[in-house]
């Protein structure tokens, strides 16, 4: 039945102590639809879906599955009800193969041995049916992020899920992988599945969703048909105010060169060159955006500038002083700020509090420490100020960084680095995982940093972002700068040509 309701969440409330993450939220999913759950960072989307998938239990409210009231008290209970969740941060074992990860906890045996042959056969059948091409014998650590996500989807299908929850599924994907994922979702719907898509990316909602439920600060605001609202109206429902998609900025007034990179060569672990004779400069008072397909040397370039990887030849100068192959802290102390690409691995210590993370670069200096002792009153009060200024939402500065949503973790890192007032600010994927309101704010802060005379280097896979904030755009391909162009005179299509090694002047 086309209009059959498969999920009904009624007045669902979830409290963590005094903090209310979900406040009487209502959500209905119909069979065969893609229902987008739209909300800004920390709105309570993931909490609500963790309740539906059995990771959390509600404080109040009801959950009905296929017309029956259910107590979903564990992921296994959710799986038995046909509910599967594809998490934003993949739950895979790097040292295991694709097959071993998919069958983990649901192993097929033949006598006392694993029946991998039967498992592989089923995986290949599912893979072909839904357009989820994978190599069953490949190790997880050897496949791309997009491939790893396919493994997560296959895990849910292998367990018989017909209701799939996608939690911010495009946060770590390249544009090409995003397009592939949208098609995979459509394939799943054709095969009778139903999908809840947690996101704050309006273009992706336009591409696949049928209906949208908007959540703001833990409350369900409205459920609308896709065609009933413009992107502007959806953004305003999501954040509760008017939002601008294009950041206004005056023409840059670049001054002296702050960062100068000349003939840079960097080898990867297997000995081949990852960065090849790359030269680039960034001046005070400008934003240089680096555009390129993931894996073309951007990560190695940033690691070299920040002292996290060895340069084989060439030079990196800061204010005309050579900093090539210096230690990371020494580079940081020369007024370099760095927002890393991977916030979990390189940006935060998840077990530490938000306040401790904000103080990571300054804890050993006054006023954060005195006579060799940490001043926790100062550390906590400073964190509270920054959390308010940058709208980092959570129960308080004393909670662990792991308890924040992905977007709020990113805002905490950006707050820490901008607060240090660096001469050079390097920002990798500045708005990955952020909602439209937060994106608008971060873009304004980057432009403000530029206007205050800072040199800003932005690395992003989001071409709209690169075009929006940059004064010059350097396109990287195969470890080399393919071209440096102006955002005013270059289209996304032309950037795409440069990103694959083409020439736009032919």
Swiss-Prot record:
One of its GO terms (cellular component) is plasma membrane. Signal peptide: none annotated. Gene3D superfamilies: P-loop containing nucleotide triphosphate hydrolases. ATP binds at residues 39-46. It is found in: Cell membrane. It holds the Pfam family ABC_tran. InterPro entries: AAA+_ATPase (IPR003593), ABC_carbohydrate_import_ATPase (IPR050107), ABC_transporter-like_ATP-bd (IPR003439), ABC_transporter-like_CS (IPR017871), P-loop_NTPase (IPR027417). Keywords: ATP-binding, Cell membrane, Membrane, Nucleotide-binding, Repeat, Translocase, Transport. Its EC number is 7.6.2.-. It is a peripheral membrane protein. Induction: Constitutively expressed. Disruption phenotype: Mutant is unable to grow on inosine as a sole purine source. Mutant shows slower uptake of uridine. The double mutant uriP-nupA is impaired in uridine transport. SMART domains: AAA. Residues 7-242, 259-503 form the ABC transporter domain. Part of an ABC transporter complex involved in the uptake of all common nucleosides. Responsible for energy coupling to the transport system. Belongs to the ABC transporter superfamily. The complex is composed of two ATP-binding proteins (NupA), two transmembrane proteins (NupB and NupC) and a solute-binding protein (BmpA). PANTHER family: CARBOHYDRATE TRANSPORT ATP-BINDING PROTEIN MG119-RELATED, GUANOSINE IMPORT ATP-BINDING PROTEIN NUPO. This is Nucleoside import ATP-binding protein NupA.
